[in-house]
């Protein structure tokens, strides 16, 4: 999604930040899913959501600096919003599961 050559980003700086945030989203999901406790998973889901917010900000900056055309920007933001909704839904589910486990 973000590593295609169609994006005309500077070689360093913003590009590295965008890549880091983009990779952090699934990396935090995977690390959290591998944890033993729901509370730990919830923590990594929160980190993943934070990385998504960071990525959104960086994409806005890239767009305003003219590195992303409006069509590409809109597509990426739309995909990122969907990812955010999925993470939010998973966070709610994990929170409910954690509450049920604590009630036992």
Put a short name on every predicted segment.
Residues 1-104:
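Amphipathic alpha-helical assembly/interaction segments
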């Amino acid at each position: 999604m973000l590593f295609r050559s169609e994006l005309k980003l500077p070689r360093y700086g913003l590009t590295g930040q965008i890549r880091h945030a983009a990779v952090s989203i699934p990396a935090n999901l995977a690390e959290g899913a591998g944890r033993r406790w729901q509370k730990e998973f919830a923590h990594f889901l929160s980190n993943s959501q934070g990385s998504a917010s960071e990525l959104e900000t960086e994409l806005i900056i890239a767009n305003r600096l003219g590195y992303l055309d409006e069509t590409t920007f809109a597509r990426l933001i739309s995909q990122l919003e969907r990812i955010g909704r999925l993470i939010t839904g998973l966070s709610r589910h994990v929170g409910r599961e954690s509450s049920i486990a604590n009630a036992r």
